[in-house]
């Protein structure tokens, strides 16, 4: 009897499942956007433009090659909004939500994947956390839509209901897509509402709330104002977020927006400090801002929001850990510390790896686009920071880019959204060494 060799079935890691899930949804979204019914002119959208839009929506970026309000039909806008919602929550979280609603049990493998997707500290309680994520998301998005309703209904009638819901979800998911462009005025974002305190404040609040992370909101809802009982990660996120909101606002107020009334300057300064992390809306002409302000926005874009949130970027915790490690080095301390707790050395290593990967993609992408399009490097750096950090801000070059440059941005948006460590672990797997090589010192600095 002939015995055939038995092949071991390949098991995908949690990180590979996350990337495959995003890629599959991205492709389906692109195909839906290619249908003539998706556009107002009932035309077939080229695949590369549909893929760019689908990737931008799913990766909650906001960069567009076609104006969302004037080019896409209600069907197309609905597809974009669905992609934004899936991308904001995460493909795995949405899949788990459907499984829970259908009464199916979540396997151990699925729980492990959900843990990685939500940046949860442990697998226990992951199903309960998923339910909390869905509830808090619905609460903020519906509350935001209700607050935006009077403004949009006053300007657009019954269509304002759709506008309020769309912009609320887009803001909380840190997407930056808007429906306010027309044939005569495309890619205007929220500039017409720059002097509207209600709309700008609500949108800014939704952006910040979405970017804090669901674990942070779990601490806030559980312990209320008892800050000392929060987990260290939540404390770091809240303090770092406050730091990254207040200081840029003061800079913009003092050095960028120096004309107009105090209220106008406050609204402009506040909103432009919020939106780079990582929403993509704007209430000012970004191309008209000074070079130092644009450079500051690039830094804010790269830093991004917080882990386990709807935002992208390197994350506030990465920035905070690198600062803490630098401070420990200055003081000749062995360990970086936060709030009376020692930071694990693997966290410092991961932070340095993520920062290095994002900066490499940021510069390399800009170099390719600048070479292909013959554009100034500074403009391309702004564009690639916006893409890899899934922000959506632009100095106006996105619609004019060629297919190669659009492909670069698609890759940056996708890589930026799935996360630095997710990409690394999916590509290289985990193979712990059973032996260690001899150690030798090397001079640094």
Feature-to-residue mapping (PLM):
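Membrane-proximal intracellular helices of multi-pass ion channels
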Residues: 1-445
